[in-house]
Amino acid sequence: MPRSSATARKSHSNRHDNGVVGSGKKVSKQKSNGHLNGNHANSSTPTSGPSSQVDWPSSRSNSDTAIPTTAAAAARLNGATENSKDIRGHLNGYAKGTSDMSYGQANGAVPQNGCLPGDAARRTEKPATASKRSGSSASVNPLHLASTILKSCPMYDTIAILIFLLQLPPMVLTLVQFLFASLTFMPPSGASAGSLTSNFDIFQGPAGTPSLGTMIAMDGFCLLFWGLFMWTWAQNFALDLAHVQVAITLGGGGSGKNGGVNALCVGIVLVLHLIRSKGIQDFVMGHLLSAKIISPDLLSQYSHLIPAEFRRTEPQSSPSWIRSLLAVHILAQAGTAMARRSMAKNRAPAPPRTGKRIDTEASAGSQTQFDSAFESGASMSSYIGPDGQFITPATHKDGRDRLISAKKRRRQANQVRSRQPFWAALASTKVTVMREYEHSRALSKTARGLTMTEDDLQGVSLDDGLVWITDVDSSTIRFAAGDFSSPDDASGSGVCETGRLSDDMEPFYVCVNGAQWATATISKVPDARKGTSAVHWRGEISGLAPNCAYTCSFMRSDTDEEICAMSVKTPATSDAEQVSSISAPPQPTYRPSSPTTTLKNSIINAEAKLNEKRSRMKKAKNDHKLVVSKIRKELENYNHRLHSGTDENRQKQRSLQLERNIKQTEEATAALGEQLDNLENIPEEELEEWTMQKAKYERELELLNSVKEELIAARSAVAREVSSLESELNSTVQRRERLQGRRTRVNEQYERIISANAQGLNERERRAAEQFAREQDQAKLEANFNEQLASITQSIQEYQLRTNQLWQQSAAIEQAIQQQQQQMLMDSAPLTPEGNLPGTNPLGDTPSLALAGLTTSAPSSRSLLGLNFPPLKSSPLQHASSLVGATSSHPASPTQTPSYLQHFPTSPLANASSPFDPDFVYRDRSFSNRSGRSSLYGFDLIDSSRRAPFQFDLSEAASEKRRSSGSESNGPNLGLRPISSPFPRAGSRASGSGSGGSGSGSGSPSSAAGKGI
């Protein structure tokens, strides 16, 4: 049954966001404009002050009132677009000014009613009927009103939709489930574009729905439960439960106290699955047959009556993963909705028993949806009214009441959708389809309503005349029009009749807010018929006030028929001076002004602009006078300076300029000096910081040095280890070579044995062969030794000859020195004329002592006949030789002829290690490499009385001979060694004589023997 009139009045202003036809009175739209002449009270549309005219941005972007006629739908559609940047020409009278511009209607439509192009012709034919219909309120037929209201039957709707869904094929069912699942991610109806990016809408859930995070969490949990714990029969049953959820949602079974609907639908699906289950069928049939309740004959007789769908011969198969995912999502959201519904029911107080079915989830979500919309639009300090005027909080006193009314309307819309969602969706679909159809029909001549410019209309022939806005200024509106001539006008152009217009006359005139506008100029485009341009007329409406809304009507000049009407709002002026000088117009109402008011405002605006222009002209004139007088004075000054100026004056000016530059330079230099002084004085803080940094740097440097020392020590240790390892490696290599040599000898012996055995020799012959081989080796060795002995003997003989020569030279030199000294002493005179001084002992008294001293010290003199001999260098071997009783002097006379072939004294180094030992490389160079020229001036004396019989080592002699091959001595360098047994292996580091008599100076035979090589 229809609701009461009070309820109808409350819901009359409701904007059904999705085109839902709610319960209420049928709205009757008037066909003519009753606001042009100020007759607002005669309007049949019930209003409650400004609240019925304001459209909030959050609810008017995609919303319209329930529209009973297609004409009203088209009118609503044509007035729903705004633009804030681009001001271009639009066809069919649809104009855009600035962002403040309101709705523009086309083809004879004013802001309150819109009609198609055909309505203008029909209104021309029946003007009286239209005016009569506009002046009276249409009566409402109760039967027609009752037929437009659907009774809420959620149980029937839900069951019907469930039966319909169960009969669909699997592919269609999958598509339906996908569409239904996608609806959970859609934004709420009536939400603005700003609310889509609101954090509240995304995470808190708009329109009572759970948040995105909650949905994802529930889907994941249900999917895990689906894959782990549900078998095939349970999965197929869950798929049909998803169909139940879709049917309950579309049929409204979840609203109010409809728990019975849910249980009934679930029971139907459960019974169907139990009947279709093969296991249950086998169990029931087996139990009936075993209990003999039904005989097999009776069962086979009536089994053909059971539908084929119920007779399963094979078990059910698992559903596809696509259907499983969709079913999991739908069931998860159903469980979430049930939980939210129970929580809201527990929190909310007990509702009064009014008999109304209320969806607690939808009612709880209405507040959420409104809050989210209010959050997204709370930052707006003003909004746009129906006339394009910005309504600020200062001028809008009842803003809170409007918020409350919008809140109530949104809650009512949610309640209507929750009661009859399926039929509401059908009604919304119908309204949307009809709206698009009327829209395409109304704009079929202009490329289906797309925004077009004059360039897009080149070459397009239009049947009816069209007028469109090309530019909107603060005080002017420019428009263009097509060709208004018709074939009837062309046929009757020869006869000038009343109502017919010539080609040069204006085919239409302009009315602004119902008053014919005298300042509107219309001009014909020259040569418009010759070309293909659609523009035939251009015009301009001037004398308008800025920031005001106007309804511009274009009327035919011959029939006074209205061509089109549009609502345009002029933008605010951008000139700050004009805004400050011109008084602001009174606050416009929410309806167009009357013609008288419009004309008065236009006159006031024109006078204000005229006064402003006059004041500006006067101000500009005064400014120009001042500028001209100033320029004249400057010109006279320059002329005077030009005529009176001389070279002297120019030089003075130049000197003054230079002095000025010098002064500026000095000031700059002083400033730079102060800066330098400031820079030289180091602040204490920086100095302390520098000291700290320096100490830190020194510590780090010490640490670095210590680390470097540690590194060097580590490297040296590693180097020592490496050297020791290398020495070990060398010794190992030598041992390996010896072993390899031994192995070679053993192999040779083995081969000889093998060869001997192979030749059949006996053991005696083999031993004889070995003995013969040994004898041959010994013979070779003996021959080698004999050769070495012969060479050594020859070398000894050569050394003896050279030694004799050296002794003879030494004796001659000593005799010459003694004779020279004696001659000097004999011929010497006293140093003073008086003779020898008292207390002195002349040398002549003791000639024997002096001669003995000279004779003794002669060999140690380092200057002999102008030759400088190097001083004798002490050697550690001299100390070693002194231990065996060797003397440091050589008292032997040169006349003695020592027998060098007698016994040599035993060397103290006779027990020294072999020269092949490792310490052989550290031998003193003075023992092995003496210069051969040193034998010319001295020779190491050898005491023959202390010598043992001469013996030598052949191996040592051979090695010494090889080492002395690079010496400067001409004679052979043989290492002689006094030994007690023939061919001993023990050698001395200082045994033998030097390389070819390379010893120097005189000395004791023991020391010479110790220094010999």
UniProtKB/Swiss-Prot annotation:
Biased composition (Polar residues): 33-64
Transmembrane residue ranges: 159-179, 212-232, 255-275
Domain of life: Eukaryota
Bias type Low complexity, positions: 1003-1013
Coiled coil: 597-806
Cellular localisation: Membrane
Keyword check for Lipid metabolism: no
Keywords: Coiled coil, Membrane, Transmembrane, Transmembrane helix, Ubl conjugation pathway
Record bears the keyword Transmembrane: yes
Function comment: Component of the regulatory network controlling carbon source utilization through ubiquitination and deubiquitination involving creA, creB, creC, creD and acrB. Involved in resistance to acriflavine, and required for normal growth on a range of sole carbon sources, including fructose, cellobiose, raffinose, and starch, and reduced utilization of amino acids, including GABA and beta-alanine, as sole carbon and nitrogen sources.
Name of the protein this chain belongs to: Probable ubiquitination network signaling protein acrB
Species in which this protein is naturally found: Aspergillus terreus (strain NIH 2624 / FGSC A1156)
